[in-house]
Protein backbone atom coordinates (compact mmCIF):
# COMPACT_ATOMS: atom_id res chain seq x y z
CA UNK A 1 0.00 0.00 0.00
CA UNK A 2 2.80 2.42 0.86
CA UNK A 3 4.48 1.62 -2.47
CA UNK A 4 1.30 2.54 -4.31
CA UNK A 5 1.05 5.78 -2.33
CA UNK A 6 4.68 6.61 -3.19
CA UNK A 7 4.02 5.93 -6.87
CA UNK A 8 0.93 8.16 -6.89
CA UNK A 9 2.84 10.92 -5.08
CA UNK A 10 5.76 10.75 -7.53
CA UNK A 11 3.36 10.79 -10.47
CA UNK A 12 1.58 13.83 -9.05
CA UNK A 13 4.87 15.67 -8.46
CA UNK A 14 6.08 14.94 -12.00
CA UNK A 15 2.74 16.00 -13.50
CA UNK A 16 2.82 19.24 -11.52
CA UNK A 17 6.42 19.94 -12.55
CA UNK A 18 5.53 19.22 -16.17
CA UNK A 19 2.68 21.76 -16.03
CA UNK A 20 4.95 24.35 -14.41
CA UNK A 21 7.65 23.78 -17.04
CA UNK A 22 5.06 24.31 -19.80
CA UNK A 23 3.97 27.60 -18.25
CA UNK A 24 7.54 28.80 -17.77
CA UNK A 25 8.51 28.22 -21.38
CA UNK A 26 9.07 31.32 -23.46
CA UNK A 27 9.10 31.73 -27.25
CA UNK A 28 11.84 29.88 -29.12
CA UNK A 29 13.82 32.98 -30.09
CA UNK A 30 13.86 34.55 -26.65
CA UNK A 31 17.12 35.08 -24.76
CA UNK A 32 15.34 34.32 -21.50
CA UNK A 33 14.17 30.91 -22.68
CA UNK A 34 15.45 29.07 -19.65
CA UNK A 35 15.70 31.92 -17.17
CA UNK A 36 12.34 31.49 -15.46
CA UNK A 37 12.69 27.71 -15.42
CA UNK A 38 16.13 27.91 -13.83
CA UNK A 39 14.99 30.41 -11.21
CA UNK A 40 12.08 28.10 -10.41
CA UNK A 41 14.41 25.08 -10.11
CA UNK A 42 16.85 27.04 -7.93
CA UNK A 43 14.13 28.17 -5.51
CA UNK A 44 12.47 24.73 -5.51
CA UNK A 45 15.74 22.98 -4.63
CA UNK A 46 16.52 25.38 -1.80
CA UNK A 47 13.00 24.99 -0.42
CA UNK A 48 13.18 21.21 -0.70
CA UNK A 49 16.54 21.12 1.09
CA UNK A 50 15.56 23.58 3.85
CA UNK A 51 14.09 20.90 6.18
CA UNK A 52 17.47 19.18 6.19
CA UNK A 53 19.25 22.38 7.16
CA UNK A 54 16.73 23.04 9.90
CA UNK A 55 17.03 19.46 11.17
CA UNK A 56 20.82 19.52 11.22
CA UNK A 57 21.33 23.19 12.14
CA UNK A 58 23.89 24.73 11.69
CA UNK A 59 24.81 22.10 9.14
CA UNK A 60 26.16 18.60 9.09
CA UNK A 61 29.72 19.00 10.39
CA UNK A 62 31.80 15.99 9.35
CA UNK A 63 34.82 14.73 11.27
CA UNK A 64 37.31 15.93 8.66
CA UNK A 65 35.94 19.45 8.85
CA UNK A 66 37.18 19.92 12.39
CA UNK A 67 40.75 20.07 11.07
CA UNK A 68 39.85 22.89 8.69
CA UNK A 69 37.93 24.70 11.43
CA UNK A 70 40.91 24.38 13.78
CA UNK A 71 43.25 25.72 11.11
CA UNK A 72 41.10 28.84 10.84
CA UNK A 73 40.28 29.60 14.48
CA UNK A 74 43.34 28.42 16.40
CA UNK A 75 46.34 30.70 16.37
CA UNK A 76 49.50 28.77 15.65
CA UNK A 77 47.72 25.70 14.28
CA UNK A 78 49.88 24.45 11.40
CA UNK A 79 48.32 24.73 7.97
CA UNK A 80 48.65 21.77 5.66
CA UNK A 81 47.04 20.62 2.46
CA UNK A 82 45.55 17.42 3.84
CA UNK A 83 42.34 19.41 3.56
CA UNK A 84 42.53 21.71 0.52
CA UNK A 85 43.73 25.19 1.36
CA UNK A 86 41.08 26.78 -0.88
CA UNK A 87 38.32 24.93 1.00
CA UNK A 88 39.80 25.88 4.37
CA UNK A 89 40.06 29.55 3.39
CA UNK A 90 36.51 29.54 1.97
CA UNK A 91 35.24 28.01 5.20
CA UNK A 92 37.29 30.59 7.11
CA UNK A 93 35.31 33.42 5.52
CA UNK A 94 32.14 32.06 7.08
CA UNK A 95 33.79 31.37 10.41
CA UNK A 96 34.80 35.05 10.49
CA UNK A 97 31.15 35.95 9.87
CA UNK A 98 30.30 33.78 12.85
CA UNK A 99 32.92 35.60 14.93
CA UNK A 100 31.17 38.89 14.16
CA UNK A 101 28.10 37.49 15.92
CA UNK A 102 30.17 35.74 18.61
CA UNK A 103 28.71 32.42 17.46
CA UNK A 104 30.49 30.06 15.09
CA UNK A 105 27.18 28.27 14.50
CA UNK A 106 25.93 31.28 12.55
CA UNK A 107 29.01 31.15 10.34
CA UNK A 108 28.63 27.42 9.78
CA UNK A 109 24.96 27.92 8.90
CA UNK A 110 25.91 30.66 6.42
CA UNK A 111 28.44 28.25 4.90
CA UNK A 112 25.76 25.55 4.61
CA UNK A 113 23.37 27.97 2.91
CA UNK A 114 26.08 29.18 0.51
CA UNK A 115 27.09 25.63 -0.35
CA UNK A 116 23.45 24.68 -0.90
CA UNK A 117 23.05 27.66 -3.23
CA UNK A 118 26.18 26.72 -5.19
CA UNK A 119 25.03 23.13 -5.54
CA UNK A 120 21.56 24.28 -6.61
CA UNK A 121 23.18 26.48 -9.28
CA UNK A 122 25.13 23.51 -10.61
CA UNK A 123 21.96 21.44 -10.77
CA UNK A 124 20.16 24.35 -12.48
CA UNK A 125 22.87 24.31 -15.10
CA UNK A 126 22.32 20.58 -15.64
CA UNK A 127 18.57 21.16 -16.04
CA UNK A 128 19.31 24.05 -18.42
CA UNK A 129 21.57 21.76 -20.44
CA UNK A 130 18.76 19.22 -20.76
CA UNK A 131 16.34 21.95 -21.84
CA UNK A 132 18.76 23.47 -24.35
CA UNK A 133 19.35 20.08 -25.94
CA UNK A 134 15.68 19.37 -26.45
CA UNK A 135 14.96 16.91 -23.66
CA UNK A 136 11.27 16.19 -23.23
CA UNK A 137 9.62 18.02 -20.34
CA UNK A 138 8.82 14.71 -18.61
CA UNK A 139 12.54 13.94 -18.37
CA UNK A 140 13.25 17.44 -17.14
CA UNK A 141 10.50 17.13 -14.53
CA UNK A 142 11.86 13.74 -13.42
CA UNK A 143 15.34 15.21 -13.11
CA UNK A 144 14.10 18.14 -11.02
CA UNK A 145 12.04 15.83 -8.81
CA UNK A 146 15.01 13.50 -8.34
CA UNK A 147 17.35 16.29 -7.23
CA UNK A 148 14.71 17.86 -4.99
CA UNK A 149 13.41 14.70 -3.34
CA UNK A 150 16.46 12.41 -3.12
CA UNK A 151 17.78 12.84 0.46
CA UNK A 152 21.39 12.30 -0.59
CA UNK A 153 21.54 15.63 -2.43
CA UNK A 154 20.00 17.55 0.47
CA UNK A 155 22.38 15.89 2.93
CA UNK A 156 25.35 16.62 0.71
CA UNK A 157 24.27 20.24 0.23
CA UNK A 158 24.50 21.00 3.96
CA UNK A 159 27.54 18.85 4.75
CA UNK A 160 30.46 20.87 6.08
CA UNK A 161 33.01 18.82 4.24
CA UNK A 162 35.46 19.36 1.42
CA UNK A 163 33.83 16.89 -0.97
CA UNK A 164 30.49 18.57 -1.85
CA UNK A 165 32.01 21.70 -3.38
CA UNK A 166 34.64 19.78 -5.31
CA UNK A 167 32.17 17.24 -6.63
CA UNK A 168 29.59 19.85 -7.64
Residue ranges of each PLM-predicted region?
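Start-transfer (signal-anchor) and selected internal transmembrane alpha helices
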Residues: 1-51
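Transmembrane-helix motifs of polytopic, lipid-linked glycan transferases
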Residues: 11-12, 110-134
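Transmembrane-helix signature of polytopic, membrane-embedded enzymes
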Residues: 35-40, 126-149, 167
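Residue-level signature of the transmembrane alpha-helical core
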Residues: 46, 109, 113-117, 141-149
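Extracytoplasmic catalytic/substrate-binding loops of multi-pass membrane glycan-assembly enzymes
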Residues: 56-70, 77-94, 102-106
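Short acidic/glycine- and proline-prone juxtamembrane loop motifs at membrane-interface regions
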Residues: 155-165
Amino acid sequence: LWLLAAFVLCYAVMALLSIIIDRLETPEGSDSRNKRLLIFVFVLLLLAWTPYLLSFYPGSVQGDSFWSIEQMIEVGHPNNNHHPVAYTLFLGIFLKIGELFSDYNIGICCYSVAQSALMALVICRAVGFLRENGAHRVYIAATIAFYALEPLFASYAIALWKDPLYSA
